Amino acid sequence: MKTIGLAILILIAMSGCQTKSTKTSLSEQRAFDLGNGAQPIVISPSTLVVDARSAFDYSTAHVPRSIPINWADYVEAEPAQHGIIQNDTYSAARRMARAGISPDSQIVVVGSGLQGNGEEGRVAWMLAYLGVANVQFSSIDALKPRLTNEPESQPPKSADIWKPVINESLNATRDEVLFAINKNAFISPVSYKGGPTRLYKFIDVRSERAYLGKEGIAAIKHVPNMEAINIPWKQFFNSALRPNDATLKQLRAMGYTPEQRIIVINDDGVSSAAVTMALRAYGFNRAANYSGGLQDLIP
């Protein structure tokens, strides 16, 4: 199996000293260049920082005025559908509005980076799916000079209630995945539900051991053949959890194109969501996350 190396660590030089409880103001605009191939992260007075980590990690250190959001609070209730984004998208949008998020918000989602499971990418994907256009994500370590452990005294004001404009192309359903498998759509292009005829490509972003059936769901259940290539999700990112140029350029060299329907898959639709957003950032505009993951495909 081919292994695609991780990007070289990119050092981020920032001014200011770090203390246990830094009170850095958001009154100034600050750009964080976190790697080639991705737009710099910009923190300005209008930026909303969303924190995708656990409540404990948030209480320990967070960006001032950031909004904690757990991706698992926005999924279907059935255990086998744990990764599927909730069907009641209006309810999800109302909760976002109460947290201060609107479709026009400039969002930066932060999380545990390569030490986590791509939760910041999953939250960013969810926001984009609901119609929030300007959303990026990175590791919170990239913003360390801004962190504080003080409780929030002035949380963001609620936004007006808004209607979600669903970007359905970001999400692959069980029905679409099974259709592609049954029609051998990874060999010959097909039309799904009357849409344009497209060739399907599957990228499995689980670990190599999980992909080979030595651990995880594939160790106890049969995974149907979808001619998926295996690239563990962390190889799509650099140390700041920004898209890794080398991996994404190699996909193009392997014949992956923006015209193809690329479906990213793992067990639960979390790290696969992060990879989907990285693919979109590099012009693979029909890339989709199978949010249900293998636990939905083979319950």
What role is predicted for each listed range?
Residues F32-G35, A77, L143-M226:
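Active-site neighborhoods of enzymes that stabilize oxyanions during catalysis
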Residues R242, T247-Q250, E259-A287, S291-P299:
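C-terminal soluble interaction/assembly domains
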